[in-house]
Amino acid sequence: MPKLEQFEIKKYWQIFSGLKPVENKVNHDQVLPILYNSKLDSSILNKIWFLADIDDDDNLDFEEFVICMRLIFDMVNKNIDKVPDELPDWLIPGSKAKLVKERKQRKQIENADIPKVETPKIDWYISPEDKKSYENILSGIQTATDGSYSYSSTTLVLKSKFFNIGTSDFEKTWKLVNPKNFASIDKDPTLYFIHILRQRNDLGCNIPSELPKALLDSFSKERVTYDLNSNQSQVTRSSNVRSNTNMSQHTIEAIRMNEIPRGNPNDAASLEIELNSLDAELNRIRDEITRQEDTILIREQFEGLLSYKEQQYQKSKQSSMSPVKLNAKSISDDLSNIEQQVGVLENYLADKKVELQQLESQIQSVNK
C-alpha cells in the first residue's frame, strides 16, 4: 500500500472543505454521500469509520478524514483486499499517535478480560417457531411460476432483515443450499438459506463448507423445469405397440424430467408445451425486473448525491467570502458523470420492460 503523497492531501483538503466543516470537523451525515458513492459494504465502511475516528467523538477532523478517504480509495481501487485491523504506522498522524497507542492498550485489556468463546456452529434443527417465522418471510418473496425462489428475489428481501451480513455471505450460503447451481430453488432449501443466514447474523456462526448428507441428497435432486433448451434429459419413443384396432400408435418409452421437443404447431399438446416454455422465459425476465429494484435504489442514491452536489455548487457561488473555494469544474464534472450513470440505468430498465411486454404478447398470442 503506497504512502500518502502531497497531492493526495491537497485533494482530500478540497473535499473536506467542500463539506463545510464545523470547528474543523465533519460528522457522519456530512460524509455519508461519499460513503454511499464508494459502493462498499456497510460492514467495511463501519470499520473504516471506526479506525479513522481515533478520538471516538463520532466526528472526523481533517487528519482523521484523510485516514478515512485513503482507506476508502485503497479498497475501491483494490490496493488492499481488506480493511486492516490496526492503522499502519505511516497513516497515523503524529498528533494522534498517543491516542492510537492508548486505544490499542484499552483493546488489549478488554480482550484479556473477556474469556475466549468458540464461534458457535450452525444448528441444523429448525424449530416449529423458527419455521413459522421463516415462512412469513417467504410470503413476502416473489416466486417463479413453479413456486421456486431465485437468488435475486430472495436476497432482496433478506438484506432488509439481516444487517450484519455482507454480499459474500449471501453468495456462499446460496451455493451451499444450491449444490446443483439451479437458477431457483424449492421451499425447503430456501428455508435453510434463511435459517443459516439468521444464525450468521444473530449469533455470528461460521457458514459451513458443506451440508449434512441427508440435506445434500435432498437439495441435489433434479428439479422439473420447462426450459426447452435444457439438456436434463431426452425423449425416446417406442414403435413396438400392439393394437386391437390395427391403428398405428406410438407410446413414450421414457420422459425424464423436462426435455420435451417442440411438436406440430397445430397440435394442442405442442402449443401447451410452447406456452410452458414462454412461462419459464417470462419468469426469467421478471427475475431481471426484480433485480432492477436494486438498480432503482442505486439510481436514488446517485440522484441524492446529484442533489447534494448541486446544493454545494450553489452555496459555493453565493459564499464569495469563504476562505476556501470549491473547485467548480470538478463539481461540474461530478454532476455530468452522475447524470450519465443515471441515464444508463434508466435506459437499461426501459429495455427490460420492453422485453417483458414482448414476451407477454407472445404468451397471449399462444393462448388465443
Curated annotation (Swiss-Prot):
Component of the PAN1 actin cytoskeleton-regulatory complex required for the internalization of endosomes during actin-coupled endocytosis. The complex links the site of endocytosis to the cell membrane-associated actin cytoskeleton. Mediates uptake of external molecules and vacuolar degradation of plasma membrane proteins. Plays a role in the proper organization of the cell membrane-associated actin cytoskeleton and promotes its destabilization. Component of the PAN1 actin cytoskeleton-regulatory complex. Transmembrane segments: none annotated. Belongs to the END3 family. Ca(2+) binds at D53, D55, D57, N59, E64. GO terms for biological process: actin filament organization; ascospore wall assembly; endocytosis; endosomal transport; reticulophagy. Pfam families: EH, End3. This is Actin cytoskeleton-regulatory complex protein END3. It is found in: Cell membrane; Endosome membrane; Cytoplasm, Cytoskeleton, Actin patch. One of its GO terms (cellular component) is endosome membrane. One of its GO terms (molecular function) is protein-macromolecule adaptor activity. Residues 40-75 form the EF-hand domain. SUPFAM superfamilies: EF-hand. Keywords: Actin-binding, Calcium, Cell membrane, Coiled coil, Cytoplasm, Cytoskeleton, Endocytosis, Endosome, Membrane, Metal-binding, Repeat. It is a peripheral membrane protein. Residues 266-368 form a coiled coil. Its main location: membrane. The keyword Lipid metabolism does not apply.
